[in-house]
């Protein structure tokens, strides 16, 4: 649905995706990572329980897009099998990645059908990378930046759709963000700047300064109905477009109405993960209780499910 607001084009779409937390492992230790809410999970593999769960989401909530998350999804040995199985069941499959897997692994995943990759690249400056990691020497930082660049260009050359996500926590990150921006602009790759939820307005203001530095003008917005997800798109003087993630004030009433936490993400979406052999739906990163972390079978009988179903099955 396309509307116009003060000459800015606004495209509104209904949420149609769910995030699968396929592993909690990651070789990086970024100081702003929220780990999708938990580290105490098991790797997801394609079995009858997961298949039935995914198809139940598809049938009841029109979910047709799966986004792998983690941890670092490529750390999971099951990722290729998951990709093939989900595609064969009619799903569009995307993954987030730090871009550090071996190139042979990346090529294999492409052969499995993976065509949409969001690279989490927060700087291409080795010194800047050291600053956002808990422990890293300069030699390792140089090696990581080189691998990331090569893998991004490799998978793009193979034909996959590539997007870069870059977190800007404060004004101290602006120069590092510009190193990524220049790389994506030079190679015709999409980039989206993300605010650090834990830094609040400090991070938001830093991105505003970055946009000014890039001499860019807002041209359009994409809003997801049933989620706090929103992206504002800007165009610089060379007509290169980039995105800025924004959080719209959307809260799930069955989860957020009585919550005392000053949540920065609001309700972003559903996350599916496995713990102690059981599948759970996670609805919040800020806390874990019976309203926000629900056994799969109980979820489909819950008030949260009813509210989400109404939102995601709107005509």
PLM region spans:
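Canonical Radical SAM [4Fe-4S] cluster-binding loop centered on the CxxxCxxC motif
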Residues: 6-49, 61, 283
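Radical SAM enzyme [4Fe-4S]-AdoMet core and its adjacent flexible, acidic
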Residues: 127, 136-254
